[in-house]
Amino acid sequence: MSNRRQTRAQAQQFIDTLTPLQHPNSEKVYLTGSREDLRVGMRQILQSDTLVGGTEADPILESNPPLKVYDCAGPYSDPDAEINVRAGLNKFRQSWIEERADTEQLAGVSSGFTQQRLADDGLDHLRFDSLLPPRRAQSGKRVTQLHYARNGIITPEMEYIAIRENMEQAGITDPVLRQKAKGESFGASIEQVITPEFVRQEVARGRAIIPLNINHPEAEPMIIGRNFLVKVNANIGNSAVTSSIEEEVEKLVWSTRWGADTVMDLSTGRYIHETREWIIRNSPVPIGTVPIYQALEKVNGVAEDLSWEVFRDTLVEQAEQGVDYFTIHAGVLLRYVPMTAKRVTGIVSRGGSIMAKWCLSHHSENFLYEHFTEICELCAAYDVSLSLGDGMRPGSIADANDEAQFSELETLGELVKIAWEYDVQTIIEGPGHIPMNLIKENMDKQLALCDEAPFYTLGPQTTDIAPGYDHFTSGIGAAMIAWYGCAMLCYVTPKEHLGLPNKEDVKQGLIAYKIAAHAGDVAKGHPTAQIRDNALSKARFEFRWEDQYNLGLDPETARAYHDESLPQESAKVAHFCSMCGPKFCSMKISQEVRDYAASQEVELQSHASYQAKSASEIETGMAQMSAEFKAKGAELYHETAVVDEELADAEA
């Protein structure tokens, strides 16, 4: 069997046998909101107890609280969920949408292209069968979360998000877990507790979006904004060269397991429409697309043949399928194209290059820009959010922060204000390849030019020297820009610039970017971000190996690395690892020093008191303590009875 067929067969088997996947020692828990059908899922990591004293036969233990963490996997991490990829996920938001009474179910699909696909019997074997007719806004209505927020309405989606962002971590009172360094948020308004009203205010202001198409009721509400947890997007999708529907559905499920907050389907190969249907119906996270890719397929890959009519029909097609956000390259203007002529890498955005070619071939202004108000009207009818694409982003650090890039950014700032006039939720896409010293300028300009609309960046990649490791080179920039205020990071996999990522590449990219996003949250001073770090550090110091693995982003890899060199059962409770061994473990030595100091009643004196002593007094005291230590066998541990006897003698 060829590698391609084998990969597809494995993906098919994955789908056929798909059951909920849980991380070790974790359980799915739900917090209920103000109504019974508002149940917010999250992962709860159970911890073992800490040994604080006693004997081997009669130990004294201190419990460690379970830790709730953000979970993107929806039903795929719930052992009680019944998973049937052919039926799709539960449409749990359907009742919320219907009770607002501002949408209507259509008799059939509106897109001419979709009608053609449905009439083609040759596609029956590829179809997702369990389809409902699409919904759209009633005439004269706007059904976006931005519209509701501006009218003072707190939707169930907003309450859901508030519960999800807090993760009930305010209930953790352990001072060791609650401690955190003072953050630097660069002007962000980060609340100690996220309330539904705060969510509403941020959405109404345009500083955050809730990407939830009314035709994607399976999606769990989430929010993108710099005053919330930093989110991560994963890209999947087939190409003309490789991949299949089965593989893309597998990647979707896999992406949510490893923490993708949203997923973009960037398919450019055959059966784009059918692939997307399977993905949306089985996705618990918002799905984004770049509609120009499919529009180009419809004109056989000839950019010059694109038209507004073809593109508009594509928007309707995808909106009625349930796409939650569109990347639209409406800022690539004709007059900006010559600015890229002297670049090292020219225009590297696929969407940007397509529109640049169309503009030059017709010597006309970008039709996405010319028809932008119509795009907004369409999005407002389905609550499709806009992601204004950066078609002029730099493809090398040599081209960073140039005239073309920032000219487009100015235009995106103009477009976001137009979108807001139509109550369309909008985010701004950013670079790209940017050296570390130029990253903050990007964030500052975006906030100023785009009136604090959420920023969504691809990296940025900080150096161009490491093909095969661009999840590292870009993860560095991603962590920095997340700290400066970027709301969502688009992951980069090890295959960036080299090929279409497989499952393992998707995982590696997501882990790298979850690290970057979390590091940004910690640096900003997010009130609960450091709790997980502290819990893991405490487990590490106490040699609770299993807890150390399970509290991490990738328990399986951590456990495998440890057991690779110390596979014995005894090593799972040992107070050392193979890095330093039993005699040189800094944490073991530190614990022994603590125990010794406590057993000897060593008095910890202030620095000022220490300085007040003469050099000779200090030297004499140190020599005395050294002699006593050696006289007792130079052992850090002593039997309790011996210590008690010595203390009694000292008191006498």
From Swiss-Prot:
Q: Which HAMAP family match?
A: ThiC (MF_00089)
Q: How does it assemble?
A: Homodimer.
Q: Which Gene3D superfamilies match?
A: 6.10.250.620, Radical SAM ThiC family, central domain
Q: PANTHER family this protein is in?
A: PHOSPHOMETHYLPYRIMIDINE SYNTHASE, CHLOROPLASTIC (PTHR30557:SF1), THIAMINE BIOSYNTHESIS PROTEIN THIC (PTHR30557)
Q: Which GO terms describe its molecular function?
A: 4 iron, 4 sulfur cluster binding; carbon-carbon lyase activity; zinc ion binding
- What does the UniProt function comment say about this protein? Catalyzes the synthesis of the hydroxymethylpyrimidine phosphate (HMP-P) moiety of thiamine from aminoimidazole ribotide (AIR) in a radical S-adenosyl-L-methionine (SAM)-dependent reaction.
Which InterPro entries does this UniProt record tie to the protein?
A: ThiC, ThiC-associated_dom, ThiC/Bza_core_dom, ThiC/BzaA/B
Q: Which domain of life is it from?
A: Bacteria
Recorded protein name is Phosphomethylpyrimidine synthase
